[in-house]
Amino acid sequence: MKSKLNQLKSRVLLPSLLFLLFACHKNPDNSPVIEKEINVNGFNKVYAGERFNVTITKGTVFYVKATGPANSVNDITWSVANNILDIQYAHHENNRPVIDIVITLPLFVQLNLSGAVTGTVSGFQGASNVLRTVLSGASKCIFNGTGVNMQIDISGASELNVNGSTESLYGNISGAGKLNAFDLASTEVDISASGGSEARVRVTDRLFAEATGGSRIYYKGTPAVKNIQTSGGGQVIQQ
């Protein structure tokens, strides 16, 4: 009798659990996909969170467009203050769909990505200003070319890939963050890595590297000036 009762419970509970599991993971926004142009300008920094796929390119005029399910696209807020374009949702909802965002602007200074945002930046190779990139959460970004100087701050499980050339690459990496810059020719590199982070850099003249915790800094090149500091299991390794 007890065995039959347990079987009956399993037959009732299992479909219910499967339904709840599916309901938690399905995309709640089944509205039609739209393209929406956004009338914003006067910014040189971009901040974005949530689940956006952001593509940024250099152009002579400002242009911003979002593509995705209508309900989600129409719930995005676009605010400009202190030269920052801040992209967020007005209302928090789990399991948002990925929204594609295209941004064109003449001058680009800083990118802040958080959450599960992915980003691609192109067209700013050789820019005379410092390009600053801040990644947190599980964000990922690719820079196809960068400015004369590039500053980075990578934390969480974020990952930055950079190619091109620059006079100086400097900044901090922590947590499980990753910097992949073997394809970026840098005259000078000044990197501090901590936690379980990893950095891969290419340097020609000057290397300043500090690795703590279980972090690793891998470098290619034979810089004449090297200032290397390690502690707590951190390593700086020539490739």
Feature-to-residue mapping (PLM):
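Extended, compositionally simple hydrophobic/Ser/Thr-rich segments
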Residues: 44-56, 101, 108-239
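Short, ordered coil/turn segments that flank beta-strands lining enzyme active or ligand-binding pockets
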Residues: 81
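Short acidic/polar N-terminal linker immediately downstream of export determinants
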Residues: 2-13, 19-73, 84-104, 119-121, ...
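Secretory-pathway extracellular proteins and peptide precursors enriched for disulfide-bonded cysteines
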Residues: 15-16, 133
